[in-house]
Amino acid sequence: MKVRMYNVGFGDCFCLRDRKKSLLVDFGTNNSRIEGRPRREIFDLIISDLSTINSKNLLLTHFHMDHLSGLLYMMKKKDISVDFGKIYLPDVFSKKEMSRTLVLLLLADLLKESGLPSRQVSLFALVDALLENRQNVELLSRGKIFENKYQTLWPDVDIIQKETDEVYDQLSRDERFNEVMDVLLDFAEKLRKIIWSMTEEGKIQVEEAQEKISLAYVYDREFRRIKAIPAFKELLNDLNENKVNLRQFKHKISIVFQNAKDGELNLLFTGDAQPEHMRMITENYDGKLPLYEHYWCIKVPHHGTQGHYF
C-alpha cells in the first residue's frame, strides 16, 4: 500500500495505491495559486499522473470546493477522458426524505458566510458535471464495505436525518418562506433522483418507473429561476441576518473510513468530519465499529486546523 498526497494548497487530494486498484480520495483546492503556479497547472499535473493508472475509483468525502474543484475542472476539459470505474459519495441520496438535507446543502453555499470565493454552489455543480459525464456511483454510510477492503465509519444516515429535521423544521416555521421552501424541496428531490439513478439500485428503479432525467441545462435554468424568486432572496437575507450556520451540514455528511481488517498498515481518513461526530466514532457510539489501536496513516479533519481538534 502506498499513499500519495498531492500538493493542492488548502485542499485535499490523496491517492491510495496497491497492486490491484487505486482510490483517489478527494480532488480539490480553495487556492487560486499553489506555490506561485495557477491551480489549473497543478490540476493538469495531477490529471496527467492519474492517466497512468489503469484501474482507479474516486471517493468524494463531501461537497466543498476544496475537496472537489479539481474533479469539476477535470470533467469540464473536453480533451480528457474521465475514466473512474466508480465514484463514491456520502449517502444523502438513497431516500426521498434526504431531499431535506440537500435543501440545506444548497442554501449553505448561497449564504454570505459560506466561505466560497467563487460563490459556486458545489452540490449543484457536481450534479451538473455528472449529468454531462455520467458515472457509476456508489453511496456510502456507516457500516458499508467498499473496494473489498475499506469500512465506512460515517455518515450515519439516521443521525444525519435527525439533525437535518431539527434545522429544516426550524426554517419551515416561518410562514413567509413556506412556499419557497417547498419549491426548493421539489428541486432538491430532482437532484437526489439524478444521483440515485447512477447507482446500481437506482438504475433499476428508474428503468422500472420509466422516469426520464433531463439534460443539465434544464436544471440550470430551473435553479436560476428559483434564485430569482423574491421570497428566496428574502430567505437568504433572513438566514444571514440571524447568522444561521448551514455550512456545518457539508461537514456533517463527510465520509470517514478505515481499512476493514486490522493490520500493520491501518488507514483512517476523516474528510472534514465534525468534532462531535469524530468523538462519537472514537467512542464507538453504537458498539458496531471500533477503531483500531494503532494506525499507519491518519488523515486529520479540516486540514489540521486547530478549531476542529477533538
Predicted regions: what they are:
Residues 1-53, 249-276:
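Conserved beta-strand hairpin/beta-sheet module of binuclear metal-dependent hydrolase folds
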Residues 10, 31-33, 63-69, 94-97, ...:
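Active-site environment of divalent metal-dependent phosphoester hydrolases
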Residues 26, 70-71, 99-101, 163-164, ...:
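Short, solvent-exposed loop/turn and secondary-structure capping segments
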Residues 36-47, 71-74, 106-130, 279-286:
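Well-ordered, non-membrane alpha-helical segments in soluble/globular domains
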Residues 77-266:
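Flexible, acidic/histidine-containing loops and adjacent segments that form or flank the divalent-metal
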